[in-house]
UniProtKB/Swiss-Prot annotation:
Chief site of localization: secreted
Keyword Signal: yes
Gene Ontology CC annotations of this record: extracellular space
Pfam families hit by this protein: GnRH
Record gene name: GNRH1
Compartments, record wording: Secreted
Protein name per its UniProtKB record: Progonadoliberin-1
Signal peptide annotation: 1-23
Length: 92
């Protein structure tokens, strides 16, 4: 019975080791890649702060899609012109 817990513990340990070996290394600047000097750490944080400020600025987007005229609006305009013609003919 002691064989199963030892085997299970070994399997979990092996899984963690393999996962750790394949993990991506993240540098000080929170960017994937190689190691960086601790001297450049402040520069990295300032770069991240600038990027965060750029994302915080509101972006204004303009709608470039023209809305088609409603068929009811066109029908209303046609009816108004017909009514004007009818009333204009009766007045003459």
């Amino acid at each position: 019975m002691e064989l199963v817990p030892k085997f299970l513990a070994g399997l979990i340990l092996l899984t963690l080791c393999v996962g750790g070996c394949y993990a991506q290394h993240w540098s000080y600047g929170l960017r994937p890649g190689g190691k960086r000097n601790a001297e450049n750490l402040i520069d990295s944080f300032q770069e991240i702060a600038k990027e965060a400020d750029q994302l915080a600025e509101p972006q204004h987007f303009e709608c470039t899609i023209s809305q088609p005229r409603s068929p009811l609006r066109a029908l209303k305009g046609a009816l108004e012109s017909l009514i004007e013609e009818e009333t204009g003919q009766k007045k003459i």
